[in-house]
A protein has these predicted regions:
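Conserved ASCE P-loop NTPase core motifs with emphasis on AAA+ ATPases
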Residues: 1-3
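ASCE P-loop NTPase motor core, strongest for the SF2 helicase catalytic module
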Residues: 5-256
Length: 256
């Protein structure tokens, strides 16, 4: 089945190839998460169906149960394919321009209805605000219109370069969330003054540990418009801290 081609918005500076336009249309559909009637009767691909053993002395009232072996969950309820997930896995081969495709998606599906990031507590200024930074008390965020990109350290600059190259001047604000600039970016993000934040898996892991102890990480204190996990196979072992940190991120849309 041939997918329809979708043109990116005028803010996108590059010319997409036909297959990239098809990918953009597919990704937009995945983010809208409109289930078909067939999806509601299909078993979710991450779940497996099993039958209870038939014995005379055991009657549980149902004939089947469902297992998700990836997260270890059991359920007696049918798990349909359409469970409101927005996003997916962009599994094209290397060299086909996956970063450019995702850049076109960021431009096409911007968050228009969500409010800008708002601190949960009252704004502070002056010396008191600076003291809160030194003691690690970042603004606690409810919801953001920004996209969070998590990538290996070696790819952070490449992501920023590609996003800026794909955007007309002044149409997309891109920042690296790493090292000493994290405190300044936390407050820029809290005022809705950035569209894309790029960080590393190492920073994500460190902030996750900090958040578990003190609850003071911007990355985990609110809901992102979109989270993109680049090179997601690096966290395929779900028992690692990096994998747990990635799962802990709250987002309306997720891509890997």
């Amino acid at each position: 089945m041939s997918l329809p081609e979708v043109n990116p918005p005028p803010t996108f500076a590059l010319e997409l190839r036909p297959y990239q336009k098809q990918a953009l249309g597919w990704m937009q559909g995945m983010e809208e998460a409109q289930p078909s009637s067939a999806q509601t009767t299909e078993l979710h691909p991450l779940w497996e169906e099993y039958a209870f053993p038939l014995t005379d002395d055991v009657d549980c009232g149902v004939g089947t149960f469902y297992l998700n072996p990836y997260i270890g969950d059991l359920s007696l309820e049918f798990q349909p394919a359409s469970r409101g997930a927005r996003g997916g896995i962009l599994a094209d081969e290397m060299g086909l321009g996956k970063t450019v495709m995702l850049a076109s998606l960021i431009h096409a599906n911007r968050c228009m209805d969500a409010p800008q990031m708002q601190p949960r507590s009252s704004q502070r200024s002056g010396p008191l605000r600076q003291a809160s930074l030194r003691f690690g008390k970042m603004p606690r965020i409810q919801r953001t219109q920004a996209t969070l990109v998590v990538a290996p350290m070696s790819l952070l600059s490449q992501w920023r370069t590609e996003l800026e190259r794909a955007s007309l001047p002044g149409t997309l604000s891109v920042d690296l969330y790493y090292g000493d600039v994290r405190e300044q970016l936390a407050h820029k993000l809290s005022h809705g003054n950035t569209d894309v934040i790029i960080t590393s898996y190492g920073t994500l892991t460190a902030e996750y540990k900090q958040h578990e102890k003190r609850g003071s990480s911007v990355l985990f204190s609110g809901t992102w418009h979109r989270v993109i996990l680049d090179e997601a196979h690096t966290i395929k072992n779900r028992s690692t801290i990096a994998a747990r940190a990635a799962c802990r991120l709250q987002a309306d849309r997720r891509w890997a």
